[in-house]
């Protein structure tokens, strides 16, 4: 029937394409043109032609073809009798006369399928459909369905939940299937005589490597099997295929996004075959695309069943494993973890450069890394199930991200490799960040979601708070805003530089003992290398030296850092500062001199006159004096001639502005 309707559509299309020359030639001209146009089908693949046939059938069922085609197709459908397989069997056996084809409407006594009418009846008992339900559409191009006068929300991503969706190949039992439905079709085919072998049954859905039929076309190749043939095994196979599909991260995220809403399949029109069997009172065949209501319900019920096993919407942050699970299975949390690993690793590398510069040990021992973490990220509080463990307790993505920065070895610790215990310590610090934010939210610093003190795992608010939590965590820990450079004022820039320098000089040295490590006193001179390292830590832009294990003089180290700065910052950022170098006294061109020489006056100068004058030279002189004064008050000596370096680095920090770290505690 599909082919017949397609032929009617093509004939009508060709009728409208005949030109005056064709008609002048009479019937012969029209026949020649028709033959020429139909011959074009030989140049397209069978799959492409089948796709056109399917689309035309959908348009016909939706009543979307023009009136001429609809009338012709309806007339053919009403006067066409399609014999059953049983009748054909009788004919082939020559035991009965050939059945007489009686023009009959197979739709007799069957009410017309009216989507709006059915949805209107359903409207009375699901008035909150847009809040409590998610509709799964078997076809990606299905139009939105209406509930009475309201249009049902149709979100494209939920089409991916349909067994008929073929967006990603599935590998089940070492064979590829475009969709769950294709897999079920093959298993249905295996119940047919001669198709027990899976390779033969596979031919029902494919006619060559990477050449698959559509679900509807694959079904048309199945014999008319009774429902009972497949029903016993159907549930097991369906669940097996769904588990395979939803083992993929993309589909897990889509299923989780549906929250706790009820999943419901959009109703479909009955196929011609289903209508015919229903009219004849025969057993309904297996139909994967237009599954029976029971089958659709079975699918959505199972999706709802596995949804909470992936990671439930209402999991509460009440134990360590819940956080660890979120870092493994939530894409956002995983990204946060990876970025945090990069940030911590970068800070460790910067401190290694500083230690080499000051002739201090900088191997990645557990006590060295712990000292860096506690100095910049707050005290390390052991997490119960990780503390003291020599086995890795972190997820794969953490290991992958950290291994991109350092080597992880079981024992040997060098300047570029750390032990599993040390890696556990870094993962522990990331978990602490989440615990701190949880406590802040529970203590009322941010609104909670759900019941009292409940923080849903997938709450958007928690994720927003995680990205904007610096001030909260600093406030909770009663710490000053050491690294707060979010507001563009010189106090934050000054405090950022001072505090990083003080941490490097005071916390990481001065005979302090951490575990079995004793840090020797270092010289108390603040030089240009110290300033550059502090800027690196604050901006995250200037990478530390790569070959930090090679012994080099301080002068050589300075040269390397300067070269590294030029490479990492790039020409664009350097250009921003080239025009802002301090000019020698006497080289400044006064504005009056420029005017006398006929220099052009800047557009908008009248508005500028109304603003208070800004003396940039005096501003940065004040910044430098404040910073050097603080260094001296801390007992640190400032190297002669460093003022210009402090000024330039302060300008860089200010230029980057809101791209700076707000602080290290979040």
Curated annotation (Swiss-Prot):
Top-rank lineage group of the source organism:
Viruses
Q: What is this protein called?
A: Uncharacterized protein 149L
Highest lineage ranks of the organism? Viruses, Varidnaviria, Bamfordvirae, Nucleocytoviricota, Megaviricetes
């Amino acid at each position: 029937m599909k082919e017949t309707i397609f032929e009617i559509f093509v004939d009508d299309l060709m009728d409208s394409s005949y030109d005056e020359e064709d008609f002048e030639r009479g019937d012969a001209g029209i026949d020649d043109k028709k033959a020429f146009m139909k011959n074009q089908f030989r140049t397209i693949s069978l799959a492409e032609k089948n796709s056109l046939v399917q689309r035309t059938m959908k348009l016909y069922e939706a009543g979307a073809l023009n009136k001429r085609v609809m009338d012709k197709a309806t007339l053919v459908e009403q006067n066409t009798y399609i014999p059953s397989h049983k009748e054909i069997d009788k004919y082939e056996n020559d035991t009965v006369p050939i059945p007489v084809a009686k023009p009959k409407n197979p739709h007799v006594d069957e009410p017309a399928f009216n989507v709006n009418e059915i949805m209107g009846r359903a409207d009375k008992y699901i008035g909150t459909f847009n809040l409590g339900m998610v509709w799964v559409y078997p076809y990606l191009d299905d139009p939105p369905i209406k509930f009475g006068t309201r249009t049902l929300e149709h979100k494209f991503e939920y089409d991916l939940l349909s067994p008929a969706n073929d967006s990603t190949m599935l590998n089940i039992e070492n064979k590829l299937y475009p969709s769950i439905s294709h897999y079920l079709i093959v298993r249905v085919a295996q119940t047919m005589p001669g198709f027990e072998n899976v390779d033969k049954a596979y031919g029902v859905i494919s006619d060559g490597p990477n050449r698959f039929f559509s679900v509807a076309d694959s079904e048309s190749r199945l014999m008319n099997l009774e429902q009972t043939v497949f029903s016993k095994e159907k549930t097991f196979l369906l669940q097996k295929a769904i588990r395979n599909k939803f083992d993929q991260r993309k589909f897990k995220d889509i299923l989780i996004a549906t929250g706790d809403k009820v999943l419901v399949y959009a109703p479909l029109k009955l196929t011609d075959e289903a209508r015919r069997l229903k009219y004849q009172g025969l057993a309904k065949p297996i139909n994967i695309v237009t599954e029976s209501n029971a089958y659709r319900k079975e699918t959505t019920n199972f999706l709802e069943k596995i949804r909470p096993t992936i990671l439930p919407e209402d999991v509460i942050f009440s134990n360590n494993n819940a956080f660890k699970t979120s870092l493994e299975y939530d894409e956002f949390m995983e990204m946060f973890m990876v970025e945090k690993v990069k940030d911590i690793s970068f800070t460790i590398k910067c401190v290694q450069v500083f230690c080499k510069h000051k002739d201090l040990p900088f191997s990645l021992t557990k006590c060295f890394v712990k000292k860096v973490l506690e100095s910049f990220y707050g005290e390390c509080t052991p997490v119960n199930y990780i503390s003291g463990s020599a086995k890795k307790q972190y997820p794969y993505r953490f290991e992958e991200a950290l291994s991109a920065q350092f080597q992880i070895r079981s024992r040997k610790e060098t300047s570029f490799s750390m032990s599993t215990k040390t890696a556990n310590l870094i993962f522990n610090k990331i978990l602490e960040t989440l615990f701190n934010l949880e406590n802040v939210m529970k203590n009322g610093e941010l609104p909670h979601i759900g019941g009292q003190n409940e923080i849903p795992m997938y709450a958007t608010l928690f994720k927003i708070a995680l990205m904007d939590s610096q001030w909260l965590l600093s406030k909770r820990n009663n710490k000053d805003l050491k690294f707060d450079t979010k507001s563009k004022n010189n106090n934050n820039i000054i405090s950022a530089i001072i505090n990083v320098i003080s941490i490097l000089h005071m916390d990481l040295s001065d005979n302090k003992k951490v575990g079995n490590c004793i840090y020797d006193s270092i010289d108390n001179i603040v030089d240009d290398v110290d300033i550059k390292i502090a800027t690196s830590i604050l901006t995250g832009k200037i990478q530390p030296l790569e070959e930090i294990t090679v012994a080099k003089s301080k002068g050589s180290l300075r040269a390397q850092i300067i070269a590294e700065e030029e490479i990492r910052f790039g020409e664009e950022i350097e250009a921003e500062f080239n025009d802002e170098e301090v000019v020698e006294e006497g080289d400044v061109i006064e504005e009056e001199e420029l005017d006398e020489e006929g220099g052009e006056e800047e557009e908008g100068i009248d508005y500028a006159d109304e603003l208070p004058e800004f003396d940039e030279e005096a501003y940065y002189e004040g910044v430098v004096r404040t910073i050097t004064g603080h260094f001296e008050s801390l007992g640190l000596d400032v190297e002669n001639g460093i003022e210009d370096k402090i000024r330039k680095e302060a300008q860089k920090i200010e230029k980057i502005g809101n791209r700076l770290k707000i602080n290290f505690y979040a």
